[in-house]
Design a protein with these regions (language model features):
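Membrane-associated feature with strongest affinity for ZDHHC
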Residues: 1-51, 55-172
């Protein structure tokens, strides 16, 4: 058992070389750098970014790339939804180009309220997923931090020593 082995090693070394910040008191294991214990999932996650209630899982070392791909695919799908809805209205509804936005929306609603709902829903999701994707790309590429590290950088020794900059950043 890894937990028992870790505890025995610490006990037998009389605490020499024991670094409390690299030990998870919940899992009773030595944590790798950049890992964090997620209270929701009750597990330590390497290169922990955040717990995502949307996917019901922690985002970290093993799945961050897949999560980014997931966000990009959602953006593509929502943009296709918008395009399809707009094309439906162009081909199926009599909307004059000189109509105001409000009149166009009323015509869209009378033509197909379901498609109007899909367009509004897609717009909402494009908005927040674009913000989330942009923040994730900024953190990964430009500052070399996870969301957890960016939020808690004042609590981590390796960030405090570098005035809040990431020692893991090797990008542009």
């Amino acid at each position: 058992n890894d937990k028992l082995k870790t505890i025995l090693e610490i006990a037998e070394s009389d605490g020499k070389g024991f670094e409390p910040t690299s030990f998870c008191s919940a899992c009773l294991i030595r944590k790798p750098p950049r890992s964090k214990h997620c209270g929701t999932c009750d597990q330590c996650v390497g290169k922990f970014d955040h717990h995502c209630p949307w996917v019901g899982n922690d985002i970290g070392y093993n799945n961050h790339r897949i999560f980014m791909l997931f966000l990009l695919l959602i953006l593509c799908i929502m943009i296709l939804n918008l395009y399809g809805g707009i094309m439906f209205y162009k081909l199926s509804c009599n909307v004059a180009s000189e109509d105001s936005l409000w009149n166009s929306i009323l015509v869209f609603n009378s033509c197909s309220s379901w498609v109007l709902w899909m367009i509004l829903n897609a717009l909402f999701h494009v908005f927040w997923v674009t913000i989330l994707t942009t923040i994730q790309i900024y953190q990964i590429v430009f500052i070399g931090m996870t969301t957890n590290e960016r939020i808690n950088r004042g609590r981590y020794k390796h960030f405090i020593e570098l005035d809040g900059k990431s020692p893991f950043h090797f990008g542009p």
